[in-house]
Amino acid sequence: MLENENQLTHQFPTLSRWNPMFISDVHKISFHPHLQRYIGFWMGFPIRWIQIVGYIAAIDIYEGKHVLTVDDCSGMVLRVVFIIQDDFSMSKRAISMSPGNVVCVFGKINSFRSEVELIAQSFEELRDPNDEWKAWQKRMRYKKNLTKISKNHHSIIRTPKKSYFPKDHAKELLKCIRQMCKLNVQAGFTIEELIIYLKAKELHLPLVHIFNVENEIVENCDGNHILALNFSLQTLLQHGRIVRKSNSVYMLVTSKDIIRFVIPLMASGLLEAHKVQSIVRDSNPMFITLPLSAIAKHICQFLLRTKGKWRQAKKYTWVRDNQFV
């Protein structure tokens, strides 16, 4: 039984590494409606990040995104999506390619309209034919090794019986934590205190869907069970809703924790989330886990409440609008 995503990643290195795959195998990835659309299963292993190599068969331009259709001669093609807002320069470089160019693409799988596509994270053009051949051999070896591992449950990568993907549970748990900590946020809380609070208030969290990897059956876990609570706490940690004060003590992250570092920077007329993130992390080691997206959310909500008019210049960057000054 897995207690958190770190353990899941330890049991399944395929979940956190780049997996070199043939496009025909990418289309064999299965998704489950109760799991995140960015996580699928291939040969019994959970998978998120993949690497493909092939030639560009088509280039399409849409509002907000560019799409390359890539063919690796394995029998199928794959849509590779470049989100303009995420990386403008990479998206621009992608459409500067020509059909027939061979590219190596790293990306995150996505279930879209019952099909699998790749959300590009990075890519490069392969000009040397030997590189394409080496990439083909690399995929053959990787698939062969995974096939051996999947047949041997005593190998380094062992198939756990169950993996957990709470969604609504984490949201409801966060509401309970906020209510529990509203009198003294800085004191923090332990999972034992959380269980006692839920019992005292007779609160019942929603069931957590449990996907049994071996038989592909979705089971349910009681929302107040320590296993469900542990995994949802890890989810809240990843999204920057809480931080660790110590190994067993968590603390709720509030807007005040972030905004006190934002206000001194406002005089310059420029706010950059990554700069605020750096200052916040330097202020206290426990904030090291705060992701950029969480910092940006607090900044955005604060700017909406301020009298001065600010506008978003680009992702995670805001400037004061001079016409309102």
From Swiss-Prot:
It comes from Schizosaccharomyces pombe (strain 972 / ATCC 24843). One of its GO terms (biological process) is telomere capping. This is Protein stn1. Interacts with ten1. It is found in: Nucleus; Chromosome, Telomere. It comes from the Eukaryota. One of its GO terms (cellular component) is CST complex. SUPFAM superfamilies: Nucleic acid-binding proteins. Residues 50-126 bind DNA. Keywords: Chromosome, DNA-binding, Nucleus, Telomere. GO terms for molecular function: single-stranded telomeric DNA binding; telomeric DNA binding. Pfam families: Stn1. Gene3D superfamilies: Nucleic acid-binding proteins. Required for telomere maintenance. InterPro entries: NA-bd_OB-fold, Stn1_N. Its main location: nucleus.
